């Protein structure tokens, strides 16, 4: 694709591995300048990483400030960092629920809040990565599901609030995307290979997992002017997992 993203400075939270790394790779292929905010350092040569604990509000502010100082502009923000941490209704508690919201939702707001002055100047775009758990439920993950519901709601709210500045806001909703974190979860199952096969069998298109790069390609499109009249959308990149008949 030629999405005219060359030299555009795009922040990717949680960009050091998994879906975030897939997004970074596709942005690099488009000659953009992805900047990762993560506790880990990106293993991709030449990619700038700002190491930060995104559950710390001041760290969010400082990360944006440092990126703006170093690069001079911010052309896009991809809110991606988070973890399905299994805080459920039966065994969770107040603190674990609140902590999960900080890991999965609050920094979406804070990064966008601090990046907003720069995005107004560049008329940039925001893409929020979300999860099917907000729509389908999963069981055993109340806080993560709530956080993703919040991500979807913020996408629509920001799309309205930022219309006046020409800033577009969309979400990419992920279902079954095979990443290192997903592999770690599979290994906790009683029969990992059997569980993996059963999940794949329920993905309508191709009976396979979505790849991080496929998520990245849609994200790159939404960041680009090729999607200049698209805002407030929750776009499912999931092989039909959420909306198509599982009997297919």
Positions of PLM-derived features:
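Short C-terminal tail/terminal secondary-structure segment
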Residues: 1, 136, 220, 231-248
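Substrate-binding pocket helix/loop in short-chain dehydrogenase/reductase
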Residues: 88-101, 199-200
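Active-site loop immediately N-terminal to the catalytic Tyr-X3-Lys motif
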Residues: 90, 136-142, 164, 207, ...
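Active-site helix of classical SDR
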Residues: 112, 147, 155
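Alpha-helical segment proximal to the catalytic Tyr-Lys
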Residues: 117, 160-164, 228
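Residue(s) in the substrate-gating loop at a strand-loop-helix junction
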Residues: 131
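C-terminal helical subdomain
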Residues: 171, 179, 193-226, 230, ...
């Amino acid at each position: 694709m030629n999405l005219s993203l060359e030299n555009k400075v795009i922040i990717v939270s949680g960009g050091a591995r998994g879906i975030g790394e897939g997004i970074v790779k596709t942005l690099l292929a488009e000659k953009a300048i992805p900047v990762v905010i993560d506790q880990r350092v990106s293993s991709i040569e030449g990619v700038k990483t700002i190491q930060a604990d995104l559950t710390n509000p001041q760290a969010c502010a400082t990360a944006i400030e440092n990126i703006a100082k170093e690069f001079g502009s911010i052309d896009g923000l991809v809110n991606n960092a988070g973890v399905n941490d299994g805080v459920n209704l039966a065994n969770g508690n107040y603190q674990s629920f609140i902590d999960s919201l900080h890991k999965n939702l609050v920094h979406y707001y804070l990064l966008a809040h601090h990046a907003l002055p720069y995005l107004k100047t560049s008329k940039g775009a925001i893409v929020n990565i979300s999860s099917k758990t907000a729509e389908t439920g999963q069981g055993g993950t109340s806080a993560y599901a709530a956080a993703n519901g919040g991500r979807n709601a913020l996408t629509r709210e920001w799309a309205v609030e930022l219309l006046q500045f020409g800033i577009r806001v969309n979400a990419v909703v992920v279902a079954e995307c095979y990443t290192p974190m997903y592999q770690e979860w599979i290994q906790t199952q009683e029969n990992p290979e059997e569980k993996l096969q059963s999940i794949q069998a329920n993905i309508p298109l191709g009976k396979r997992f979505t790849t991080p790069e496929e998520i990245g390609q849609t994200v790159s499109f939404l960041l680009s002017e090729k999607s200049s009249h698209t805002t407030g959308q929750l776009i499912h990149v999931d092989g039909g997992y959420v909306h198509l008949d599982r009997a297919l």
